[in-house]
Amino acid sequence: MADRPNIILITSDQHRGDCFGFEGRAVKTPHLDLMAKGGTRFSNCITPSVFCQPARASILTGQLPSTHGVADNGINLDPAAGEAGFAGTLARAGYDTGVFGKAHFSTRATYQPTDTPECKTGSQSYPDDWNGPYMGFSHVELIVHGHLSKARANPIPPEGQQYERYLASRLADGGAYDMWATELPPSTGAAQTWHSGLPVKWHSSTWIGDRTIDWLRGRKKDTPFCTWVSFADPHHAFDCPEPWSRRHAPEAVDLPQHRPMDHARRPRWVRTAVGAEPIVADPAIREPGWPGQR
């Protein structure tokens, strides 16, 4: 199997590349430290986009946003481009391929319904036993609402995919979402940061890890595999459950160096994009919690 190695790609969302124990920071990541020591670290990786969908499409296809066409959130990746990416290429070479967690190759909140499994309306047409294929992956178990929000209604199946159905099935009448939104004392004083009352065993990170392990244990051992384990955190809202939410005392965290905006050395379009106020004709778009907001 040396010429056809097994591959596990692990990603986290909106996570500083140096915020690990193995990078010398004062954070406790012993399991990640072991994996970094025995695996491959992408220490010199620079994302081609600060936005989620373009960056994920680039990981899958190996192309820049200007080539694969996903220039911003809200633009779906062409399925043909997705199929030509690393997952489809390996699948055609005889690999078992899977993705677990947040794929975000397609848009959840759309003005018009689409037929993608990640669309809030399109996902409702997929049966409960659907597990792919999708964008070159032969097996998928997805989180459609990667980040829950108190500012909008939470997904109730049939909207969503595997994780949404799992979480909704824990308690009747949306009880699991109520537990997630429960703030345990003491309050942080920040709107999107709290000690969540959701049991850690129901959290999306636990679910992603467990589903990946079950898939690896249940597959044929004589076939090489490639799986993308895509954790949706630590992206805000910072809603970690106990005991993990109290693992680090705030005063013990070594903050990164603050880097002020240096627009003078940046291209004009960067200065315009960062410093200008967008022209919005529809006042509803300015309302907090509008689905299209980043």
Where are the language model's segments positioned?
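Formylglycine-dependent sulfatase
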Residues: M1-R294
